[in-house]
């Protein structure tokens, strides 16, 4: 019987029962070009309003995985599990740059397929492109070699991995259907499955700087990812973490790379960044069978940091992908620095009771460190550092942050935006946890 995309779309629109084989046929048509952009848009909008049942979400994820190459690590002679993490994104979220090396130093193999920033959120690929020579788009063969030799490779989605997802996402991006939980789930997990990942630790952000607008929707997304990931044969757990302020006390591409290097070498380990990094990395070790429990995992991760093994793995990955061999030892020699730096003075004394993390991310975009639209050229040197935290006591005139900009005018504009993002009150706010919940 001939498969008609419009009939499949009608079933999704009308919430009729879906045959998983039809889901696969639709995705095959997307890949082959037999399904038009208009039909993809109609499908995406139908899913946005109705969502998909679990069986169809799993089928969509597997079909998108199978639309291109699927990496099989069994022939690579790896002596450990293939594991990964993924974040829904936020501000100052540089966990990928530290978790990957930590887990690799503990015996895991991490082929991390990452993305670029859009809107207020920073992208891991953008951070890595601040490193001179670093190749974020190696061939599949190079990806295999780097993962085998360094234990990790943080790169972008290649044309061969989940191409159907790439086409569907391009349509979602211009049809106001990005926020569909079913489509987000399939997009994230199809790429992880295509990369041959056996276990995934998912970081779902909650708060003013989160991708999802409410805590309830963040929890719903986490549940969907866990159920679909496990249903598709990849051990998956999700952690809900706080994004009511920047995770690290900085935001901006080169600035965050420097922060990651400081974390790995022990020069500075901000408490919130450490809490989330250890929670996710410990999940990866326990799910991958590299640790007996969370306590054992944390002990191993701490040893990987203190011995320098994690920093060495990061350095090995950077060099293997074309970056400077001495980046960890001499980051100031290689990472770009902005021409102007200016402190952001607090307008009044008091306690920091609220931070609009999204506004901080948009301030970085305004400086040129993020994209207002796809295709924008980035200034990797700009951003924010020394960000004051929620609950901190400040005096009038005390710096809330330092702005790094290409010139004094843009620094002044960003400083105004940062100042408005902070609300200072007379009483200290209630303390909040950085790790809210774990969903398994």
UniProtKB/Swiss-Prot annotation:
EC number: 2.4.2.4
Glycosyltransferase keyword on record: yes
One Pfam family hit: PYNP_C
Listed pathway(s): Pyrimidine metabolism; dTMP biosynthesis via salvage pathway; dTMP from thymine: step 1/2
One GO cellular component, as annotated: cytosol
Catalytic activity, reaction form: thymidine + phosphate = 2-deoxy-alpha-D-ribose 1-phosphate + thymine
Enzyme class: transferase
Function: The enzymes which catalyze the reversible phosphorolysis of pyrimidine nucleosides are involved in the degradation of these compounds and in their utilization as carbon and energy sources, or in the rescue of pyrimidine bases for nucleotide synthesis.
PANTHER family tied to this protein: THYMIDINE PHOSPHORYLASE
Subunit relationships: Homodimer.
Protein name: Thymidine phosphorylase
Source organism per UniProt: Burkholderia pseudomallei (strain 668)
């Amino acid at each position: 019987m001939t498969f008609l995309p419009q009939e499949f779309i009608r079933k999704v629109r009308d919430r009729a029962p879906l045959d998983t084989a039809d889901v696969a046929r639709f995705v095959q048509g997307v890949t082959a070009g037999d399904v038009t952009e208009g039909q993809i848009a109609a499908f995406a909008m139908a899913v946005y309003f109705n969502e998909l049942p679990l069986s169809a979400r799993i089928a969509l994820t597997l079909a998108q995985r199978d639309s291109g190459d699927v990496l099989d690590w069994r022939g690579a002679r790896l002596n450990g599990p293939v594991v990964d993490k993924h974040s829904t994104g936020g501000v100052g979220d540089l966990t990928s740059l530290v978790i990957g090396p930590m887990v690799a130093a503990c015996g895991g193999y991490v082929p991390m397929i990452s993305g670029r920033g859009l809107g207020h959120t920073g992208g891991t690929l953008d951070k890595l492109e601040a490193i001179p020579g670093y190749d974020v788009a190696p061939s599949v063969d190079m990806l295999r070699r780097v993962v085998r030799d360094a234990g990790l490779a943080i790169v972008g989605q290649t044309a061969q991995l989940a191409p159907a997802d790439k086409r569907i996402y391009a349509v979602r991006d211009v049809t106001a259907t990005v926020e569909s939980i079913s489509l987000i789930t399939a997009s994230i997990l199809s790429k992880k499955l295509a990369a041959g990942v056996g276990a995934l630790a998912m970081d779902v952000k909650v708060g003013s700087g989160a991708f999802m607008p409410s805590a309830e929707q963040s929890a719903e997304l986490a549940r969907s990812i866990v159920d679909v990931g496990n249903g598709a044969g990849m051990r998956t757990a999700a952690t809900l973490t706080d994004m009511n302020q920047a995770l690290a006390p900085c935001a901006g591409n080169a600035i965050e790379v420097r922060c990651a290097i400081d974390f790995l070498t022990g020069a500075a380990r901000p408490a919130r960044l450490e809490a989330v990094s250890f929670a996710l990395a410990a999940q990866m070790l326990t799910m991958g069978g590299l640790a007996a429990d969370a306590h054992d995992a944390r002990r191993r991760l701490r040893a990987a940091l203190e011995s320098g093994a994690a920093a060495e793995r990061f350095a090995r990955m950077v060099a293997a992908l074309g970056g400077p061999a001495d980046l960890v030892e001499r980051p100031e020699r290689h990472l770009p620095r902005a021409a102007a730096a200016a402190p952001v003075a607090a307008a009044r004394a008091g306690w920091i009771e609220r931070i609009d993390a999204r506004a901080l991310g948009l301030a970085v975009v305004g400086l040129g460190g993020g994209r207002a639209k796809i295709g924008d050229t980035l200034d990797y040197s700009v951003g924010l550092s020394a960000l004051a935290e929620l609950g901190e006591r400040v005096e009038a005139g005390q710096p809330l942050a330092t702005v790094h900009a290409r010139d004094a005018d843009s620094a002044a504009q960003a400083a105004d935006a940062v100042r408005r993002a902070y609300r200072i009150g007379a009483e200290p706010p209630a303390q909040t946890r950085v790790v809210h919940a774990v969903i398994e």
